[in-house]
């Protein structure tokens, strides 16, 4: 199976299946001397693990991380970092009645067409549990970014029709509700909406927003590895993501150049922008202002309502999916989006060291 490695200089390779013995990641290209502990990585994994509220799957997994290599006495050694998380609460029998069915909204049919066989137990590699490796690798990248003064703030902007206006954000309450929304009142409204979805045996999608602060100007690799293109690819590779926008995104289609252009000013010897419609990126290169990224998350495809589909014999059938499934995946996907953004930024920062001879001289002379 190709496509399980992401990155150029800072790379992650994820492995494992939803109902296999374990999942994990190998992180390559991490510099030596970065402080890193299991507790630090665990804090990231805890943000995505299941069973933390009525709005997540009831599957009970501690998602406890083990560091197998690449860290010694609390610091990275510069060698590959191997991280593993054991599966403990698989219930594969939940899938026996649908193992020969193509579940609507899932990758069952396409995997059959590509490989000629598939792991029907929870979707195998297509399961949301695949993101464990992304988050563990993202924790390593985030630790590097912290050392460089770069901060990522990621949260749920919308669940279903409940969307928080930008002028109503309160970042201090993001971790005070299980939906990771930056407004307590809107979090309550979203919870009520999700209660109705559960009652209707249905699910919801939503919108995740990531704000990146402290990113220096000049990072990004034109033409095909632009910063925004790289971020979009990274985030779009997450199974539940159906769209990515940077800055004003799709709303620019109804704007004008006189409005959309961000005017520059010089202040205390610094070049600044008066607005940030571009979302911190111009020409595929960071401009020094905050990078603003949003990811559209589709409704969880596993629902208990009867749905029409086809089985592997080509017969028209109707199924209702039982088992333990999230009515909304958005809150658990927040840290996944953040992790993929962190991995992308770390990789491009390392690539940027080759853009000027002065950078190499600073290292070697």
Residue ranges and their predicted role:
Residues 1-59:
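N-terminal, positively charged regions that mediate nucleic acid binding
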Residues 11-14, 119-130, 217-221, 276-281, ...:
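A short glycine/serine-rich beta->alpha loop
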Residues 15, 21, 201-204, 208-316:
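Glycine-rich anion/phosphate-binding loop at the beta-strand->alpha-helix junction
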Residues 21-33, 128-150, 225, 229-233, ...:
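Alpha-helical support elements that line or immediately flank enzyme active sites
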Residues 44-104, 108:
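Glycine-rich, N-terminal phosphate-binding loop and its surrounding beta-alpha-beta segment
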Residues 99-124, 307-325:
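Short acidic, glycine/tyrosine-flanked loop/strand segments centered on an H-E-D-like triad
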Residues 113-223:
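Glycine-rich, mobile lid/loop segments that gate access to catalytic sites or pores
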